[in-house]
Amino acid sequence: MGFNINIIGTGGTRPLHNRYLSSVLIEYNGDNFLFDCGEGTQMSLRKQKISWQKIKMICITHLHADHITGLLGIVMLMSQSGETRKEPLIIAGPVGIKNYTKTNIDILKIYKNYEIIYKEIIIDKTEKIIYEDKTKKIEYTRLKHSIECVGYLFIEKDKPGKFNTEKAEELNIPKGPIRKTLQDGKEILIDGKIIKPSEILGESKKGLKVAYITDTGYFKELIQQIKNFNLVIIESTFKNELKKEADKKLHLTAGGAANIVKQAKVLKTGLIHFSERYTLRKDLENLLKEAKLEYPDGEIFLTKDGMRLEANKNNFIIK
């Protein structure tokens, strides 16, 4: 349970023997959300002993192969794991995600014993919130890439403050569901008097905010979207020396990624989506150095396949 971030893969373009394609799984009190699903994602999930059957929603950033070719394998496995899936699978992504998935299910004659709910995103037209419940929501944000591409914002809702039992007794609020109503942030009526949650509850606790941002070139609008986020997982495809190539392909350099999170005053930043040309650890360390030179006051780290981060107060701790 809890609020955890699992790094499923960290590479771009093609999987390497020690680095699968970029993918992140967020666990939140038993609900699992997978972001991107390139080739080999199921292998990485298996290595990390994460059940694909527990994935509630898969969010695809865009329809390039290195972010989507593992999707059909996950869809198939959910019907072949020996247990019947009890709830629908939600698949979200830019326009085309539904056609891609349904067409391949039909062509490959994939047996499926559960419902899939598709949420296709028409950028700047679809409602920003693509998932919401009592404790959290997921929003999309436009990115700047060679095809339609979105980033995802996982936002934990503020938690209500401590319930003041003594005050509740003073106001003759009976124990039971009516107190729960106040804890849910709703007013109640007692003896003809309206009682507001603020009269009974202490100061609320700010929810944590996590962003998954890949693939994109630099653009200012993104900065405001991730302002003051607790954790941003952002692409760092190239070294700074390849800025021209990065700009042409609409990707970010390490310095470019750091510049964005610096302006956004992000608390903690994980670099991801490393070019296949960087196979040595020292290459990745150089990416990190370039990012830290741009944002020396920032808490920046290299993501790694199999890494896990756990929420701790207003931060995420690498375990």
From Swiss-Prot:
GO molecular function annotations of the record: 3'-tRNA processing endoribonuclease activity; zinc ion binding
One Pfam family per UniProt: Lactamase_B
Active site: D66
Cited HAMAP family: RNase_Z_BN (MF_01818)
Cofactor(s) this protein requires: Zn(2+)
Sorted UniProt keywords: Endonuclease, Hydrolase, Metal-binding, Nuclease, tRNA processing, Zinc
Function: Zinc phosphodiesterase, which displays some tRNA 3'-processing endonuclease activity. Probably involved in tRNA maturation, by removing a 3'-trailer from precursor tRNA.
EC number: 3.1.26.11
Highest classification ranks of the organism: Bacteria, Pseudomonadati, Spirochaetota, Spirochaetia, Spirochaetales
Chain sites annotated for binding Zn(2+) 1: H62, H64, H145, D215
Catalytic reactions of this protein: Endonucleolytic cleavage of RNA, removing extra 3' nucleotides from tRNA precursor, generating 3' termini of tRNAs. A 3'-hydroxy group is left at the tRNA terminus and a 5'-phosphoryl group is left at the trailer molecule
Quaternary organization: Homodimer.
Binding-site positions, Zn(2+) 2: D66, H67, D215, H273
Highest taxon above the source species: Bacteria
Manner of cofactor binding, per the entry note: Binds 2 Zn(2+) ions.
Name this polypeptide is given: Ribonuclease Z
UniProt KW Metal-binding keyword: yes
Presence of the UniProt keyword Glycoprotein in the record: no
Family: Belongs to the RNase Z family.
